[in-house]
């Protein structure tokens, strides 16, 4: 059993105090040189101070009800013959309309949610074990890429077949193997093998064959001492947009995506963590992703100019830049959403293991989302993350001011874009937007609960009671706050994030405790602990 003290307490970075403690900049590992005005007159990062009791001001009965209803939606999504959850459902839980497709991420989310349902007393230990055994047995039978052990992105949840025709519109699908989706599936295997010993052998039989080195391109950034992960690959030639190769040298060449994941504050870092922990990817890869893009005019398509300093870790120059928002410096994600920033933190206790980087940035990301929703946009509610679109479809929701995407992860139905400009290079196109019908996504507020528990809880209570965005399967996926339009469906991943957050806050970090056993703690904790982000409260 992993001692919970090894995980530590999440940190809040909203006090104007000086960060004390041990200096992590060991000789040979970290060096720094200033660049831009920020380096000369920058505020020191705000401290990471221990959070107050994680359940202060929260009614446990309400949490239990939310968890029970959320679990009911996942049960309704899951095909009883295969144990595979659909991507989403609509309609009553007694006769749900399942999507006809699922992914490794969805399957992983269902499995870790099963453990949490057991921990909360919603299901028995025997039911937990039976459900996990059924799902894992099905996974062992699914077609997958044998040389790497990776799974395809889309399967039919009713029979386990690889999806080649999209159920919603009949379009052709080229079966794809995603690095990030396989990352979430592997993360779930790592949780359940420790949380439920009765399925450890089955889980390990799948996990032991998954090699994330298949995605690692050591030459992705010429002149940099480490590489990046591809978005994924096809094992049969797609229509276009690929480069051939095979980084493992095992089996025939595959068709890699042209893109790599090159941004730090985004969800693919879960695949990086697992690959590093298992010795499949070099640790220096962690520092090859960019915290923010450079502050030169070549990058002036960014919606604001970053400020920061350069530091060197493991021989790699890292621009420790940040965006400025409401008196804070925040290392941005691509879209300014809660999912990219905080979902990996459900598994890796980033805030406590890396108090000078994630420990500051996560808390400020949550604060920025809250202040944006309540103070800037004046929506009256907060929590923004990719989810269903009220009225139909799917939209990447976020807080544009803390995201790098020039088109913005929008926060309202009108797709209002923020653009502060890039000082010295171009003026802003919309530095002071007028916000419209804001869309909040409940799973984002649940992710925030580990950093602002009472505020997140109260926000969710309002979403349920005032916006009526709640059904028999828990919170609906999204709601527009002015029109009251609700996306009345449940997405399996979003429901799994809800239960993942509840599990960590109310079940003694159950996801983290089981994920970090073994190689994760010994490899990832010292690696991420040496870094200092450019994040902090401006003083």
What would you call each of these model-derived segments?
Residues 1-13, 23-32, 36-38:
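N-terminal secretory signal peptides
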Residues 47-539:
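Ser/Thr/Asn(+Pro)-rich, low-complexity disordered segments
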